[in-house]
């Protein structure tokens, strides 16, 4: 049984339908990427999973349980971690306070979980009292991921984690995601930086105009002439 399974998903915002029958699945321990052009519906697919886009049809199951249409908080409580593309930290709060907010499901911030995430992102441990809004873009992204990992979710959803980062920081960000996955967290990522995402992931899905176009192992998609020509710039 897949940890996450999406079948024939239709979703959107208000009366605007964006997805038209999208299918995807993520097995426990996998690292899966969703790529495609702007407006393909990549982020909408992820937001539908976490309850932030309107569910208009189809199935979404997490760990065998139907979560389609549930409020976001209920989905997070079931063990889905989510990091949105923007506005993903509390800028006026400190690093430590942001991490503490991530522990709301646990009641407090256990030392063990704090140590685990700071081992993953040691630079955050060097500045616990710094306001999140004063961190660099890359550091804010690390803080957002660290906060999402505090409750120890089995599945982590990342929406465009490299967006807005300087080119030399993109590979570093993907290194962090690799290590998160290597520690046993299942990862589903939406990424505009398609070549890097497909090179790093186990499997990938290519969406266009709200529909599935291709699905295969990451390396296979990278080497597919049609995928390269249509979606990867040749």
In which residue ranges do the predicted regions lie?
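ABC-type ATPase nucleotide-binding domains, specifically the catalytic core motifs of the NBD
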Residues: 14, 95-112, 120-122, 234
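The feature captures the beta-strand-to-loop junction immediately N-terminal to the Walker
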Residues: 35-37
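Helix-to-loop junction immediately C-terminal to a conserved catalytic motif
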Residues: 50
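Conserved ABC transporter NBD signature motif
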Residues: 58-67, 78, 112-114, 216
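ABC ATPase C-loop
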Residues: 148-149
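Conserved catalytic motifs of ABC-family nucleotide-binding domains
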Residues: 152
């Amino acid at each position: 049984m897949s940890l996450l399974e999406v079948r024939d998903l239709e979703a959107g915002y208000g009366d605007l339908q964006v997805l038209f029958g999208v299918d995807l699945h993520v097995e426990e321990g996998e690292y899966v990427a969703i790529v495609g052009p702007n407006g393909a519906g990549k982020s909408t697919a992820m937001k539908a999973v976490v309850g932030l886009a309107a569910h208009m049809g189809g199935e979404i199951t997490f760990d065998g349980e139907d979560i389609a249409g549930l409020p976001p908080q209920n989905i997070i409580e079931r063990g889905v971690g989510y990091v949105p593309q923007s506005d993903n930290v509390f800028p006026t709060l400190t690093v430590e306070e942001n991490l503490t907010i991530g522990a709301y499901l646990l009641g407090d911030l256990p030392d063990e979980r704090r140590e685990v995430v700071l081992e993953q992102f040691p630079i955050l441990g060097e500045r616990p009292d710094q306001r999140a809004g004063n961190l660099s873009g890359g550091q804010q992204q690390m803080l957002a991921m660290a906060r999402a990992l505090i409750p120890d979710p089995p599945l982590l959803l990342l929406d465009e984690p490299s967006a807005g980062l300087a080119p030399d920081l993109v590979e570093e960000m993907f290194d962090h995601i690799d290590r998160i996955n290597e520690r046993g967290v299942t990862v589903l990522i939406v990424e505009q930086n398609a070549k890097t995402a497909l090179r790093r992931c186990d499997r990938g899905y290519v969406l266009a105009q709200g529909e599935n176009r291709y699905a295969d192992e990451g390396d296979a998609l990278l080497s597919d002439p049609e995928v390269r020509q249509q979606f990867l710039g040749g």
